[in-house]
A protein has these predicted regions:
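N-terminal accessory/capping or targeting/presequence segment of soluble
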Residues: 2-107, 111, 115, 119-164
């Protein structure tokens, strides 16, 4: 079992191979549901080590941050202790929200990556327009966390769908 720091280092290696400068890992599934997602979609938790339902992780070449809200500060402090992941306390003074952070920290002519299946089209369009001003691009076709997770990733839910 890899440590959080080892998983982040592997993600950084994949980012470098793909030419990605900053990688965004939201907590959503492919239906854009943020809470109560199947284990398969718990990429934020797998990479950061934080098991709380709300939040996202952002990784750059020299920074890894977990954004979450006040309901989870104590839990996050405990679960991130001893890792390279910095707790970013949402709605606290001096903490930039994730989307502006992505825009501000994608370098000129750089590349922001994320799994396009778990980010809303409105966020992707907004990011694309903002990054265009920096001559930067989006890379949305690869789920790099899947590669890091490998064969140990839980399988997609296979239960039958039914009408309530």
């Amino acid at each position: 079992m890899q440590t959080v720091d080892q998983r982040i280092e592997k993600l950084r290696e994949l980012m470098e191979e793909k030419g990605i400068d900053i990688y965004y890992i939201p907590n959503e599934d492919d239906h854009l549901s943020e809470e109560y997602t199947a284990d398969y979609f718990k990429c934020k938790s797998f990479i950061s080590g934080f098991s709380g339902e709300a939040g996202c992780t952002i990784v750059t070449k020299d920074f890894a941050g977990l954004w979450t809200d006040g309901r989870y500060f104590t839990q996050a402090e405990h679960e991130l202790e001893g890792t390279c992941v910095t707790l970013m306390r949402l709605r606290q003074e001096g903490v930039v929200d994730p989307i502006p952070f992505l825009i501000d920290n994608t370098p000129e002519n750089g590349c922001l990556g994320f799994d396009g299946k778990v980010v809303s089209s409105s966020d992707a369009i907004h990011l694309s327009k903002e990054l265009e001003k920096k001559n930067a691009k989006l890379h949305t076709t690869d789920d790099l966390v899947d590669t890091v997770w490998g064969k140990d990733r839980p399988s997609m839910p296979q239960e039958e769908i039914y009408i309530l």
